[in-house]
Structure formats: C-alpha cells, structure tokens
C-alpha cells in the first residue's frame, strides 16, 4: 500500500515538473518588449588630459642660466631736462631661480580647479669695469628683474566632447631683488578664455582670446590650443602663440621635446626712478624673448621628474617706456638692444599620476 502511494506521488511530481518546463519553453518574451528602464542615463564628461601627453607639473624647482650677451642701453632725456648717457655693457651671464606650484583644489568629473604660485628672477652679472652710468644698467646690476605671482586654472567639461578652459594670473614685475616686497603699481593681470573640442582621447582643440604681457606689453590676442597624440611615439602640445612642442616618447618614463616659448613681461622700474630721482612717474621695461629649445624630461623616482632644457634665446623687445597705455602710439623712452645667447634650465618636478 505504501509503495502504491509513493509511486502515485512520484508520478504527480514528475507531471508538474514537465508541465513547468514546457511552460518556460513556451513563454512569450514579447510581453517584455515595451518595458523601459526607470533609471536616468549617466552623463559623461571629457577629461583635461590626452592619452600619451606629458605629465602635469604640480611643483617645480628650477635654475635658469643664460650665457654671455651685450646690452646697449640708449640715451634718453627726461621732461625736466635731465639727460642720461648711452652705454654698452657686456653681460657675462644671467641666472635666476624658477619656482612654480599648481595644486588642484577641486577635481571631479564636472570641475577641475587649480591654484598656483610662481617665481622667476633674472640676475645680471656684468663684466668687471662696467661703469653703469645709464640708469637701466645700474638698476639691472643692483637689483635684477623679478616676477612673482598667483594664478588659477579652471577646466569645465560641458559634455563628453566640449569644454571651457579659463586661466588668470596676477604677477608683480619689477626691478626688485628676491626677498624685497613689490608694490601695487608693479601688478599685472593676465587672463585667457577658450572653448574647446575633445573628439577623441588623443586629441584636444580649443580657440579663444588672451590678455597677455608675453610680448612685453599689454596685448589682446587670439589663441589656439592643440594637443594631439599621433601614435605611441609622436605627438604635439601647443598653446599658440605662447608655446609649441613636438613630443617624442621614448617610453613611459622618458620624453623628448623640440619647440619654442615666448617669454616676456612689463617691469615697473621703481628702484631706478627712486635712485635717480627721475621725473618719470611710470617707467617700465618692455621685455620679450623667444626661446627655441630642446628638452629632455625623465622620471628619477616615482612621480619626481627631472627636466633638462637647452636652447637659444632670441631677444624680441627690451625697450623702456613711460606708463602703460594700451594702444598708445607714442615713442619709447629708449629703444635698447640685447644680443642673443645660448641658455640652459634644469628643473625638478613633482608630477601628477
């Protein structure tokens, strides 16, 4: 009797299992065709880097050395009748510290904001016997030129393909030595605004406008950003007309660059005016140069990289002017000339991962 019950229950369970399997095989999945996802699609944003690009420098400590050159300081007369003589002086070398920091304070998919500071000094070692009768040569010999400032960069991706990039800096430029406090009238403000496209992870392109002093005086110029990695070895990194580089990647820890950079600023000569009791109220040195260069950058330990740069400094402008009047057609107080030396710069850099 028990065996009959067990056999009957086995037949029932087997029938239910077979029926269930057939039901699964014959189920009409078309009923799910119109089901929609309830979640909102995640929006993607482009990044500020390209694949294969050079690592971003967070902190840099450097030393700049320029070889022998000759400065010809033209004579000039002051409004009250004073006259300052023409003088030609040999410079044995220029040297100075280069320090930079650019630290991200906000870094997420929607915003990247960095705050930074910079210091660049140029000391003048004139040949022995230099008279320094011309006020410009005298202040360069005594004080040199110094730039120190603060800056910020904001990268705002709009979507996966477009972005806005803004930069702003406030620099104090003048004939003051390192350790001396600059004054308010030595402040210069620069800024840039670009709109860009990132079509692939290996290419960025942007156009915009910049207020800059790289040409030695206040200028408003169009600018172009173009960063592209062509293959595993070659690429370009440009922000025209300020700088441009062809990049060759030896491996992930060694890179070579060939290119140029336009360097310059307008320096308020407060010490020169004070020492010579000048009747001019706003004498400035309009300094600008083009540096054609080769650079080798390599990792020395983890994220610490060394950069060795060598090239030729081409003087573009070294004139003295009174006041800062954008678009002014008045003549320079003195149109000076400066010959072109070779130069070398070495920097130790902490780079981003």
Q: Where in this protein do the model-derived segments appear?
A:
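Hydrophobic, lipid-facing positions within transmembrane beta-strands of outer-membrane proteins
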Residues: 57, 93-99, 146-152, 172, ...
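Short sequence motifs at beta-strands and strand-loop junctions characteristic
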Residues: 87-95, 140-146, 183-187, 216-218, ...
């Amino acid at each position: 009797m028990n065996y009959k019950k067990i056999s009957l229950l086995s037949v029932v369970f087997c029938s239910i299992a077979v029926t269930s399997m057939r039901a699964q095989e014959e189920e009409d999945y078309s009923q799910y065709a119109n089901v929609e996802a309830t979640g909102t699609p995640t929006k993607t944003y482009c990044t500020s880097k390209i694949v294969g690009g050079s690592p971003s420098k967070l902190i840099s400590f450097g030393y700049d050395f320029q070889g022998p050159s000759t400065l010809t300081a033209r004579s000039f007369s002051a409004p009250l009748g004073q006259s300052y003589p023409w003088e030609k002086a040999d410079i044995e070398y220029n040297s100075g510290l280069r320090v930079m920091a650019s630290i991200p304070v906000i870094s997420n998919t929607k915003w990247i904001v960095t705050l930074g500071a910079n210091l660049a000094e140029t000391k003048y070692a004139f040949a022995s016997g230099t008279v320094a009768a011309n006020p410009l040569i005298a202040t360069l010999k005594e004080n040199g030129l110094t730039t120190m400032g603060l800056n910020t960069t904001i990268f705002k991706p709009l979507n996966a393909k477009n972005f806005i990039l803004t930069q702003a800096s406030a620099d104090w430029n003048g004939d003051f030595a390192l350790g001396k406090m600059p004054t308010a009238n030595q402040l210069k403000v620069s800024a840039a605004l670009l709109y860009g496209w990132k079509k692939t992870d290996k290419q960025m392109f942007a156009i915009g406008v910049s207020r800059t002093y790289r040409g030695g005086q206040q200028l408003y110029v169009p600018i172009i950003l173009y960063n592209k990695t062509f293959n595993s070895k070659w690429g370009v990194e440009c922000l025209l007309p300020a700088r441009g580089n062809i990049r060759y990647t030896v491996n992930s820890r060694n890179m070579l660059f060939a290119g140029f950079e336009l360097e310059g600023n307008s320096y308020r000569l407060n010490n020169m005016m004070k020492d010579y009791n000048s009747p001019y109220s706003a004498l400035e040195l309009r300094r600008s140069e083009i540096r054609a260069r080769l650079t080798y950058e390599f990792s020395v330990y983890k994220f610490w990289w060394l950069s060795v740069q060598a090239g030729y400094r081409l003087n573009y402008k070294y004139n003295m002017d009174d006041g800062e009047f954008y678009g002014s057609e008045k003549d320079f107080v003195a149109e000076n000339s400066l010959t072109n030396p070779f130069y070398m710069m070495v920097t130790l850099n902490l780079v981003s991962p």
